[in-house]
């Protein structure tokens, strides 16, 4: 679902891995920002889904909180010094929100600092607060549009602030296109000189140069199921374009790679 949504967005500077959070932590100190959309007890779905109400239990809340604590710790390891951590759930109870943050702050003592404060207009109906260095936001369904959720932000204390370099895999996980294929693929994109192309299972994908190295590194460490912009397949040297290419909105601004991870990992 996440990979399909990325294609609908029309962006190409994205990699979608499917991994356990402990595997994401292999990229220690690499990410500028990590968003943890944690699996939760789903109290924000009570109004919308009957099964959310019938499946809820105190034991389920405790289980979710334990899982959330583990995910946060692995995400923190993957975040570089000076990086930003965002935490969110679609539930309202203290245990899975401020309670998890409180336990995390004990575990990460001395490593956190407040993120830049976000000014929130009272007319928006958002309930703002704080838990230690975390700035917190509660979105209640009777105050805002939607079913409601919880969010919080904190920054990792800068200790040099440098991103850790992750060793490149000995073998390049991406099969880069040959010259003949490149000539055909370049006809379909703007700024072709800024792109590289790779084939995966007979389908070609395009990567902006600043993204290509990052995706190659990620593919050597994580289980990346989608990345770049799907170009299509070549038949007798002519591209049969993929639907994703029609949705492609063009080059990213700033030369950064977005990483979308399912399961609340990162």
Predicted feature locations:
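Class I S-adenosyl-L-methionine
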Residues: 116-144
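Core SAM-dependent methyltransferase catalytic element
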Residues: 33, 135-166
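Polybasic, low-complexity RNA-engagement segments
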Residues: 147, 157-266
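Conserved Class I S-adenosyl-L-methionine
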Residues: 31, 59, 67, 98-124
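Mobile active-site "lid"/loop adjacent to the S-adenosyl-L-methionine
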Residues: 19, 33-73, 90-98
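S-adenosyl-L-methionine
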Residues: 1-29
